[in-house]
Amino acid sequence: MCGELLDTEIINKLPKNEFYDVINPEDWYYNAVYYCASRGYIQGNEKGQFMPDGKLTREQFVVILGRVAGADLSQYTETKFTDVKINSWYGSSVAWANKNGYVNGISKCKFGVGKNIDRESLATILYRYAQKQGIDVSSKADLTVYSDYAKISSWSKDACAWAVNAGLLGSTNTNYLILSPKMTVTRAQAAKIFMSFDSIK
C-alpha cells in the first residue's frame, strides 16, 4: 500500500481498472484495489503497477484520506510542520488533516514525512475523522481477546476498538488473534480498509 502519489505517478494515464500486478480475482485485495482505484482514492504508477505489498507512509495516507473525504485543499496554504513543504504533492493534504484535527505530528514541529504508518496510527486518524464527520463511533470491540493487547498504545485503544468493531481491522493471523498494532500498513490493506470505511461513512 506504499507508493501513493509518487513523484513519478501519472494519474489517469493508464486504462481504468487495469494493474499488471493485480490480476487474480481470488486475491483477497483484488476487489478493494479496483474499488478504490475506480474512485480515485489510490492510483498506480506509470508502469501500470499498483504495488499491493508496498508500504504506506504517513503523508501518503493523508493524501488518500483527503481524496476519500473529497476535501477542498485550495485553502490550505501553510503548515506548522518544518518537514512538510506546502507546495509538495502532499503538503496541502497534511495541512488539511492537521488543521481539522485528524492527524498530529510525531513531535511539535515534525509531521514525520517518509515514515511508514502503522495500524494503530491509521485507526486513530480514521477514528478522529469519523468522529468529526458525525459517524457513530460508540460501538467498540473487546481488544483483550487479542494476544498482543498489551502492545496497543494507550492513546490508540479506543480507536482500535472502534476499528475492529467496524470491520476495518482484525487479526493478522488466521490461527490465533493478534492485532499487530505496530505493523506497517500496505497499499493492499489500505484499499481494503477504505473500501470498508466507505460502507460506514
Named regions from a protein language model:
Residues 2-30, 43-59, 66-92, 99-120, ...:
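Feature responds to low-complexity, polar/acidic, surface-exposed segments characteristic
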